[in-house]
Amino acid sequence: MIFLMTKDSFLLQGFWQLKDNHEMIKINSLSEIKKVGNKPFKVIIDTYHNHILDEEAIKFLEKLDAERIIVLAPYHISKLKAKAPIYFVSRKESIKNLLEITYGKHLPHKNSQLCFSHNQFKIMQLILKNKNESNITSTLNISQQTLKIQKFNIMYKLKLRRMSDIVTLGITSYF
């Protein structure tokens, strides 16, 4: 059984046509995932315009007893603070490869996607929500200096000159 969370109708149709004999259920929120007996299940989450990955979502995904949780995104979060089997896969991957990965194909260790730490990911989310520096430091319980260093690292990874340029990137619709 596969739970699929996406707003992309083309992606949904591709999965429906290639699903083989596996049962596939489209969901609109993580709370719709219900464990069905002892059946193993997988979860696919498309982050494009979903704004789904936050602390509550990560905690919810940890509690699930899913075989695999695949997140379709143009980035991956290194050292994600979760015990769940979460895999970040590029959204540009072919539907056929996505299904093979979903069914258990081994993922290569080398990942050419952008790689953010868990804190960098949370900082980017808060910046995109127009939070100021004091709100960010208090929310994440980090110092001003740590925030400055993390912002510099984010700007370096995204090749930005100013942090305000982050809103012009195509990647922001995934946060």
UniProtKB/Swiss-Prot annotation:
Induction: By acidic conditions. Could be induced by EvgA via the induction of YdeO. By heat shock (shift from 30 to 45 degrees Celsius) (at protein level). Disulfide bonds: none annotated. GO terms for cellular component: transcription regulator complex. Pfam families: GerE. Keywords: Activator, DNA-binding, Stress response, Transcription, Transcription regulation. Residues 109-174 form the HTH luxR-type domain. Residues 133-152 bind DNA. The keyword Transport does not apply. The keyword Transcription regulation applies. It comes from the Bacteria. GO terms for molecular function: DNA binding. One of its GO terms (biological process) is cellular stress response to acidic pH. InterPro entries: Sig_transdc_resp-reg_C-effctor (IPR016032), Tscrpt_reg_LuxR_C (IPR000792), WH-like_DNA-bd_sf (IPR036388). Regulates the expression of several genes involved in acid resistance. Required for the expression of gadA and gadBC, among others, regardless of media or growth conditions. Binds directly to the 20 bp GAD box found in the control regions of both loci. This is Transcriptional regulator GadE. It comes from Escherichia coli (strain K12). The gene is gadE.
